[in-house]
């Protein structure tokens, strides 16, 4: 009877598998914040402040858009003011002619 020695041959990877990561993404900047400075002259319809929510409230001659953007309703001078103790507002005062 012929007896054979069988070798236990195991093959392993010669390179490690390329793993995956759940990080490595970032969102685009939204360009929020003041678009007009205090004391600046703006025309009607100009965007004054882009925001999420109401960081700053609309004052005189200022409207609020659907995305909470504040815009000038008339041509005039921009003023950032305090509204009470802990709130801020932006107003536009027409230039006297």
UniProtKB/Swiss-Prot annotation:
It holds the Pfam family Ribosomal_L27. Belongs to the bacterial ribosomal protein bL27 family. NCBIfam families: L27. GO terms for cellular component: cytosolic large ribosomal subunit. One of its GO terms (molecular function) is structural constituent of ribosome. This is Large ribosomal subunit protein bL27. InterPro entries: Ribosomal_bL27, Ribosomal_bL27_CS. One of its GO terms (biological process) is translation. The N-terminus is cleaved by ribosomal processing cysteine protease Prp. HAMAP family: Ribosomal_bL27. Residues 1-12 form a propeptide. It comes from the Bacteria. Keywords: Ribonucleoprotein, Ribosomal protein. Residues 14-37 are annotated as: Disordered.
């Amino acid at each position: 009877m012929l007896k054979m020695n069988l070798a236990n041959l195991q093959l392993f990877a010669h390179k490690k598998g390329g793993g995956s990561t759940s990080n490595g993404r970032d969102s685009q900047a939204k360009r929020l914040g003041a678009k007009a400075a205090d004391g600046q002259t703006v025309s009607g319809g100009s965007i004054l402040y882009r925001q999420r929510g109401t960081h700053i409230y609309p004052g005189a001659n200022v409207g609020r858009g659907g995305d909470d953007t504040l815009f000038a309703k008339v041509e005039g001078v921009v003023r950032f003011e305090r509204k009470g103790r802990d709130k801020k507002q932006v107003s536009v005062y027409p230039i006297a002619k």
